Amino acid sequence: MSRLLGGTLERVCKAVLLLCLLHFLVAVILYFDVYAQHLAFFSRFSARGPAHALHPAASSSSSSSNCSRPNATASSSGLPEVPSALPGPTAPTLPPCPDSPPGLVGRLLIEFTSPMPLERVQRENPGVLMGGRYTPPDCTPAQTVAVIIPFRHREHHLRYWLHYLHPILRRQRLRYGVYVINQHGEDTFNRAKLLNVGFLEALKEDAAYDCFIFSDVDLVPMDDRNLYRCGDQPRHFAIAMDKFGFRLPYAGYFGGVSGLSKAQFLRINGFPNEYWGWGGEDDDIFNRISLTGMKISRPDIRIGRYRMIKHDRDKHNEPNPQRFTKIQNTKLTMKRDGIGSVRYQVLEVSRQPLFTNITVDIGRPPSWPPRG
């Protein structure tokens, strides 16, 4: 009996031992499996960073310095691919600038008696960038306008021009730049050739210019509704100057302030280069416009009023004795004399807070009468 009981007890002990061994083996297997999972988790954590491991939803609003993205595609290693360059914030699309700007004043009081230091003008126009560039902050203009001023020894006039014109052009919602083309030396002045130079040099700085306003430095508009824009036809702005009794002096007058699109300017081969001294070039330009089948566009005479800063005639800007003969021959000369034949040398380009000054050597006039 005792032998039978001992055998049974031995079998029970073996069975219990076998169960304990089996339980131990299962526990060991489960332990290593859990350890492997934890190891993989912490490996991903250290590779991606704590913000992505603990708060994956927050990565969608993280700064651009974070390279990972929650929706990035997985690489062969199982980790998200990092883009080579992260896109920056997209600038909002601005609406087109209105045809009739809402901030215009209308008739303006223009006077030239108060001193006008350049520092004051600069303080009054904080939105104008270096070089005289401006872009409206709240709309997209249809044109990019280059304002070209032929210049020599007129610093006093230029300060008044900048004082009045920058606020006007800004209210007109223009994207524009101001270029003062300064003739070097004391030889005879050549207004039209300087305007050709301004056209070319402005395009070198910004090929987007598609409208060109050519303005004498001593003329200021008396109404900001006289919009400095280009249209389907060449535009004459200064149609009623005070020196002419606020009347158009004659039907073909195109002087003072005018505007042409880039295409219109090239169509007439620019302006003549051979008008040295005062007078004649405006009539030649009018002839070029007429000969190419275009017409002059003008504002209402009540809006196209201008005040001129009074001054004596400039030294070395005497009347051109050949002007009447040249005007009669525009048809013969316009193809050879113009933007395609202008020769000059740029001596200095200086970007000032309110304008870009370009000093140029445009050569000397031929002797009168011409030789040969």
From Swiss-Prot:
Entry keyword Mitochondrion: no
Any single GO BP term: glycosylation
Regions crossing the membrane: 16-36
Cytoplasmic side: 1-15
Membrane topology: Single-pass type II membrane protein
Binding residues annotated for Mn(2+), in chain numbering: 218, 311
Cysteine pairs bridged by disulfides in the record: 97-139, 211-230
Tissue: Weakly expressed in various tissues. Highest expression in prostate, testis, ovary, intestine, muscle, and in fetal brain.
Residues that coordinate or bind UDP-alpha-D-galactose: 150-154, 189-191, 217-218, 278, 311-313
Example of a GO cellular component annotation carried by this entry: Golgi membrane
Pfam families assigned to the protein according to its UniProt record, in alphabetical order: Glyco_transf_7C, Glyco_transf_7N
Main location, first listed in the record: Golgi
Regions of compositional bias (Polar residues) in chain numbering: 66-78
Residue sites binding N-acetyl-D-glucosamine per the record: 280-283, 323
Enzymatic class: transferase
Family according to the record: Belongs to the glycosyltransferase 7 family.
Free-text function comment from the UniProt entry: Responsible for the synthesis of complex-type N-linked oligosaccharides in many glycoproteins as well as the carbohydrate moieties of glycolipids. Can produce lactose.
Protein name stated in the entry: Beta-1,4-galactosyltransferase 2
Organism of this sequence: Homo sapiens (Human)
